[in-house]
Amino acid sequence: MAPSRTSTVKNKNASKHAANGSGIRNSKTVSRAQSDGVSKSKGKKATQSKGAPPKQQKQGSKLATLKKKRRVYTEKELGIPALNMITPVGVEKPKGKKKGKVFVDDRESMMTILAMVNADKDGQIESKMMRARQMEEIREARKAEHERKQQLQKEKLSEMKQGLRKKRNRGGDDDGDNGRGEALAGTKPLKPKKKTVSFA
């Protein structure tokens, strides 16, 4: 008879693991396949067993309560100014009154304030005018002084000129004839002639 072939099994557990799709007994896939059911973490069990609720839920509840309690304020409460109002500079708005519309209760007091302001402005203008007048007077005084000095100098010069002329006239009359005679006699030398040089 011919010998019959028998199938030899090298690994006894290979048939079991073939269904799972792996041949290794201690592989990760096997452990995953076994624990594919409901997985529960140990940390969660420990916190839940203590009885303390998770922190994330607390924060969420706080935010929800804050959102519910948030109040909506009106424009009057916030103090937002109304548009299209012309207000003078430096006037502070009193609470509950229109800004820049009513300045003073009494008309007389308002007029006195206005008169004081106008007086200050006039005083400033007057002081400027006074300064200008004073400067003009100072300029005129300086000009007059300068003219006086020039006139004195002119008078001194004219006196000096007249004195020199008188001396010339007196000296010319006395020495005129004597000079001519001396020049002729030879005692007083005549003016020497200028030397001239001619080039050929």
From Swiss-Prot:
Residues 1-68, 135-200 are annotated as: Disordered. Transmembrane segments: none annotated. Residues 190-200 have a biased composition (Basic residues). Disulfide bonds: none annotated. The keyword Iron-sulfur does not apply. InterPro entries: Loc1. GO terms for molecular function: mRNA binding. GO terms for cellular component: nucleolus; preribosome, large subunit precursor. Keywords: Coiled coil, mRNA transport, Nucleus, Ribosome biogenesis, Transport. It is found in: Nucleus, Nucleolus. Belongs to the LOC1 family. Required for efficient assembly and nuclear export of the 60S ribosomal subunit. This is 60S ribosomal subunit assembly/export protein LOC1. The gene is LOC1.
